[in-house]
Amino acid sequence: MEEPKMGLEEYKGVYIYAQQVDNKLSNIAFELVGKAKELAADLNTEVTAVLLGSNVKALATELGEYGADKVIVVDNPALETYRTEPYAQALVSVINEYKPEIMLVGATAIGRDLGPTVSARVKTGLTADCTKLEIGDFPINAMPGQEQKHNQLLMTRPAFGGNTIATIACPDNRPQMATVRPGVMQKLPKEAGRAAEVIEFNPTLEENNRYVEIMDIVKAVGNVENIMDAKVLVSGGRGVGSAENFEMLRDLASVSYTHLTLP
């Protein structure tokens, strides 16, 4: 029996998944809030950040200062460290309860795991690794015999190995979901004292056979930078020829305030 189509008019608001690791918000969370504010302005709606974790409520303050209008906090010991199943259950519960029109997730290691899992469970589409998001008509150019729908999320991403650019829409299902590449969108200036409405939501997280147990976490120690935060990279490989020549690249990176990477 065919499932009834969802009432698209029930879905409102631009939501973002506010990634945090070790109770520290990732930069992508602020970038998504910045882009969400632009989209929300076009739709005359609000921006809601979804914050999942354990003892993370205090992070809602910073999300408000960067532009979020509301923060939904799901605080549960099962969410202390990222695991696919409990995080997917939590985000699916938020979507089913609050019905966002748009749901944005960072295209990080976590987001690339969480986003597709959630989109499959709520039976909607997801466009991955987006580099541009805007509100517009779909089809972009009116076509005879085909309805042109307005106020759609147009999601642009590289395709076919980067040889072409595709613009994708999800006109018949909600939420419209996308993962967004870090470093592409701009975060807004921090507005000290700006407060978001904080909503505490506590869905039941059911342990099942998809749960995994984290036995241990070993964190690397050293002066290793996160290249996702870098504007410029100096990279060297086998072609450098020797350890001595590689030091020249290290010197270049140090004087130009860039990061040195290996391919």
State where each predicted segment sits.
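N-terminal glycine-rich FAD/FM-binding segment characteristic of electron-transfer flavoproteins
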Residues: 1-260
